[in-house]
Amino acid sequence: MSQTSLKKERDPSILILDFGSQYSELIARRIRETNVFSLVVSNCISIKEINNINPKGIILSGGPNSVYEQNAPKCDEKIFNLGIPILGICYGMQLMVKELGGSVIPATKKAEYGRAPINIDQESDLLSDVQDKSIMWMSHGDSIKCLPVGFNKIAHTENTLHAAISNDLKKLFGVQFHPEVIHSEYGMTVIKNFVYKISCCAADWTTETYIEETIPRIREQVGNKKVLLALSGGVDSSTLAFLLNKAIGNQLTCMFIDQGFMRKGEPEFLMNFFDKKFHIKVEYINARKRFISKLKGITEPEQKRKIIGEEFIRVFEEESNRLGPFQYLAQGTLYPDVIESAGTNIDPKTGERIAVKIKSHHNVGGLPKDLQFKLVEPLRKLFKDEVRQVGAALGLPAEIIKRHPFPGPGLAIRILGEVNNEKLDCLRDADWIVRDEIKKAGLYNEIWQAFAVLLPVKTVGVMGDKRTYAWPIVLRCVSSEDGMTADWSKIPFKILERIANRIVNEVISVNRVVYDITSKPPGTIEWE
């Protein structure tokens, strides 16, 4: 069955035009939290494409540029005459004002960044139920000098005369603050007002409707052909395995490549869980010796990643040829991957988007072009939290759904320097203790990631009246919403003490434990 004959996928009710904002993805997530489907598209989208999608509302995102710059990104100005409600956020509002005959200038007082109370000047559907003098998050250096004809000022701050504007007749609205960020007290109220009161969207984007719509599409796309899935045991590939199994049953084969860098007990758990408990066909490939031999003498982290990725491809090729033939390859690509792959760079000469190379997915490590698979990517329009919801609805247990993120190269990049079996055994035991104690303390679901890192140095210690010279272990525990930024977790000292005592007493070759209290930025979550 050809791809073109497939039933049309659901169109977004709210379309988000991206002008390079760091928050565009967050806007989409916030709208979906209201049970309304939204997608992020390029600011260069054509009027014809918009009409084909027929959205209920459009949001113009913020962005790092100034609208009065020569090559500032724009959108087709006819968008404002479509009769579709539009909300401009920050740069999006300034662009709307400029395109409709108003004027934008550099801030006359000072740039406004951070929290600021807004003063509501008049009633508006956009600010309905928003409390006067509530805190909103500002991040702008330019301001509106003169509004276009038909617009009214509906809110201001101490430093911004036009904090929110409206043209009720044409249903055009703008806010200088960012309602999508958590710091804006009534931000979700503003978003809900635009989505429901102004755009009249239906709250029909739910986990149940997604599953109901997706399973028939998978069956239609695949037909009676065979599908191969590289299973890692993470929430993405696990959810995908359950979804495909529900849709096509025995046509699915999962391949689990054990490269030797998994956490303690995970290979056994995954095989027992998928193959024996839920009867999902999983081919176990023991490639531990191959991978560890390739890393002998390798200390540079990017080189380790590259070697692991290349070896994964080789193993995947060999085993897929042995088990096949397969006509389809299933990938757990998520919507953030799609957004990132589409590119967000602005050409300084033309002001248009620059296409960027599509990144390889971590589950398959960048497959070679001569593998003649057709792709099945049913999760490609979902965010991580939505994938977890789908997994829960399909029956995945909490121990997988709430599993902490784990890097594709596994423990190989949590061992700084050269990787060998002795270090892997040491780190596995230490890492298991960290997670065990965090779970016992009831903190596991409150922490984004909790793990151990093995350093490539040795330290002096004293144990049993004898001098020791052994490795130190670093504890890394962070709290985050999406992994883009993170704070180190303020774990009670008693729990840290218990973890440290267990590690130095139960793990051979470790005599010291330290706690990493670096946030991201400036640090990263992983050490390599």
From Swiss-Prot:
Positions bound to ATP: S232, G233, G234, V235, D236, S237, S238
InterPro entries: Class_I_gatase-like, GATASE, GMP_synth_C, GMP_synth_GATase, GMP_synthase, GMPS_ATP_PPase_dom, NAD/GMP_synthase, Rossmann-like_a/b/a_fold
Enzyme Commission number, as recorded: 6.3.5.2
Source organism superkingdom: Bacteria
GMPS ATP-PPase domain boundaries: 205-403
Any Gene Ontology CC annotation: cytosol
Matching PROSITE patterns: GATASE_TYPE_1, GMPS_ATP_PPASE
Catalytic activity line of the entry: XMP + L-glutamine + ATP + H2O = GMP + L-glutamate + AMP + diphosphate + 2 H(+)
Enzyme class: ligase
Record keywords: ATP-binding, Glutamine amidotransferase, GMP biosynthesis, Ligase, Nucleotide-binding, Purine biosynthesis
Cystine residue pairs: none
Pathway: Purine metabolism; GMP biosynthesis; GMP from XMP (L-Gln route): step 1/1
Pfam families, per database record: GATase (PF00117), GMP_synt_C (PF00958), NAD_synthase (PF02540)
Signal sequence, renumbered to the chain: none
Subunit structure: Homodimer.
NCBIfam families cross-referenced by the UniProt entry: guaA_Cterm, guaA_Nterm, PRK00074.1
Protein name, per record: GMP synthase [glutamine-hydrolyzing]
